[in-house]
Every structure is written in C-alpha cells, then in structure tokens.
Design a protein with these regions (language model features):
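Ribosome-associated RNA-binding proteins
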Residues: 1-175
Length: 175
C-alpha cells in the first residue's frame, strides 16, 4: 500500500515535467519581420512586427502576429499568438486536401485544389509556407487580389478551415 502512495506522490510531484514532455513539437516559420514606427510628441518610436506560421506538419497550423521593441521578443510573442490560433485540418492518405476550397481575407482570395501524389506544393509566398507547415504535401494554390503576406496567410487559413471530410458531410446530411 505504501509503495502505491509513493508512486502516486512521484506522479503528482513530476506532473509539470510530464506535461512539458508530452507537448507536441511545432515547426515555426517566419514569414516577415518589419520595422514599424509610432510617431509621438517626443519623436518616432521604433518597434518590430513579426509574422510567424507554426504547425506540427500533421494537420495543425496557426498564424501569429506580434510587435515588440526587439526582434527576438516580437518573434516569441508571435509564436504564442500562433498557438492560440491553431486550427486542425483533415488530410487525405496522399497528404493532400480532401476537396477544392476558396479562402478570403480582405482583398486576398486563395484558391486551393487537391493534387495527385508526387506533385508537391505548387503555391507561392505565404500560402506555400502555411501549407508546408500544416503538413500538406500535394496541393495547387493560386493567390488573387493582393500580395500582402499577412492577409494571404490568413486567407489560406480561412480556406483550410472550410475543409470537411466525407463522414462530417454524412453526419450533417443525416441529422
């Protein structure tokens, strides 16, 4: 009986350590760091804005944006913001998307279509980074409207959010 209590206490004592070990590893990719300034009465105050995409390369992806006085802190804050905005998307066996989708954000419009195995990620700019970090290996994407990196990344995320599987469609139709 006492040995069981000791094991239980060990588990409780090391619970924080165990939680950190089980946390999934995320891949972080920096889209852009820009220098921004705020004009005040005393002059211009410079800071940095970081746009980061992070995902587990297995169907989870998020975009984070943050500002800070230096680049390192902006990057860290953007990573935490990206973790708050994670979405999960369904992937097919060929690591493609299940169907065509269109994502919009602001003036940006992203058209994504599934591709056959071996074709790779055919996309440009921020959309390519979002798809690679999400774990999509075979897809064709086209950017329309704007070249803004942040808006294109968010449009890609909104398009990926709309993806559904066959079972989800069946459930929706049956109920």
């Amino acid at each position: 009986m006492s040995s069981d209590l000791k094991q239980l206490n060990k588990l409780k004592k090391n619970s924080r350590r165990n939680n950190q070990l089980q946390e999934p590893k995320f891949v972080e990719r920096l889209i852009k760091i820009s220098r921004v300034s705020k004009v005040t009465k005393g002059g211009k105050k410079l800071s940095f804005r970081a746009i980061v995409v992070l995902g587990d390369e297995n169907g989870k992806v998020g975009v984070g944006v943050a500002k800070a006085d230096d680049v390192v802190n902006a990057f860290k804050k953007a990573k935490t913001d990206g973790r708050k905005n994670l979405i999960t998307l369904p992937l097919t066996k060929s690591l493609s998307i299940p169907h065509d989708t269109v994502g919009q954000f602001g003036a940006c419009k992203i058209i994504m279509k599934p591709a056959i195995e071996g074709s790779g990620v055919i996309a440009g700019g921020a959309v390519r980074i979002v798809l690679e970090v999400a774990g999509v290996k075979n897809v064709i994407a086209k950017q329309l409207g704007s070249n803004n990196l942040l808006n294109n990344a968010r449009a890609a995320i909104s398009g990926l959010e709309q993806l559904t599987t066959k079972t989800e469609v069946e459930k929706r139709r049956n109920s």
